Structure formats: structure tokens, C-alpha cells
Amino acid sequence: MSEFGNGYKWSQAAVKGLLLALITIVCNTITYIFPGSTIVSLLAFIVRTVASIWLLVTFMKQYAATTGENPMSFALCTVLLSSLVCAFYDAAAIAWLFPSLMGQIDEAMTQSLSMMPAEGQGIMERMMDHYPRIAFFSTFIKDFIFGLIVAAIANSSTRKKDIFDDEGKQEEDELA
């Protein structure tokens, strides 16, 4: 392990995770403010996705350059914290910050309920009472899995193998 400990990794991951979450929060807020605009929603989605990928890869490269360690564990910490912040924001936005959003969701659900059988309608109505919690967990899982995939791809594409390291020599000695 290098001179940097777990405390350094987690403190850096917290700061970088907040910056990463800020992009998602800003883009989601824009879509909440302009709910009917498909173009605004699409642009916000594209900006959020591209900026998040670019930032995570940049943070991983910075961490690897600073510590000399494999940045995958740092990226997982960053993605975990960022996903938690985004999930809390989405739940708060639905429950308190944008109450009209919950009304729109409820209206869409009511329209789709008319096509459901009676037992399905009862389940959906009970589910709507817990929608902020459902949004929290679904956002957390979605963001964490997306971040995990991006981190894994970035880690495998940026990893440099040193052909002159001691491990390779030990393997050759064992084969001889």
C-alpha cells in the first residue's frame, strides 16, 4: 500500500462523488422544472451521461497518478457516494421539492390504471403511497450499476501493464 491510506481514498471519493452527483442533480432539476419538454429532457440526459463518464474517468486518472494505485476501489467508493446523494435528491425532489412532479406521476398512473384489472389497481394505488422510497432505491441501484460499469471499462482501458515487473520474472523462473 502506498503512503496514502483509506482515509485519503474516502475523503477524495466523498469530494469527487459530490461533484459527480452535482451534475446529475442539476440535469434532473432542469428536467423537473421543464417537465413537458422532450428536447430539454433529452439534452439534459445527454449532458448528464457524457459529463458523468468524463468526470469519473478523469477522477480515476487523477487518483492513479497521485497514489500510484489501481483506481478501481476509489472509483467504487466515488460511485457509491455519488449514487447515495443522487438517490436522496430524487426522493426529496419527488416528496417535497417538486410536489407537482408527484401529481404528474399520479396522473399518469391513474390513466394506466383504467386498463388494469381491479387487483392490479389496488397494488398500484398502494405503491404510489411509497413512491419516494421506490424512487430512492431504484435511482441508487441504477446509478451505482451504471457507475460500476463505467469504472470497470475505464479501469481496463487505462491500466498499463509493465512488462519489466518482478511478477513476470517470477512466473518465468517457475516455468523453467
Q: Where on the chain are the PLM-derived regions?
A:
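Functional transmembrane-helix hotspots
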Residues: F88-M115
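Short membrane-interface loop/juxtamembrane segments of multi-pass integral membrane proteins
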Residues: Q111-Y131
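Transmembrane alpha-helical insertion/packing segments
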Residues: M1-Q62
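Membrane-helix interface/capping segments
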Residues: F59-S73
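Alpha-helical transmembrane segments of multi-pass membrane proteins
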Residues: S11-L19, S73-C86
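Transmembrane alpha-helical segments in integral membrane proteins
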Residues: P132-I163
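Alpha-helical transmembrane segments of multipass membrane proteins
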Residues: I23-T31, R48-S52, S82-D90, F146, ...
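Low-complexity, intrinsically disordered extramembrane tails and loops of integral membrane proteins
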Residues: M1-G7, R159-A176
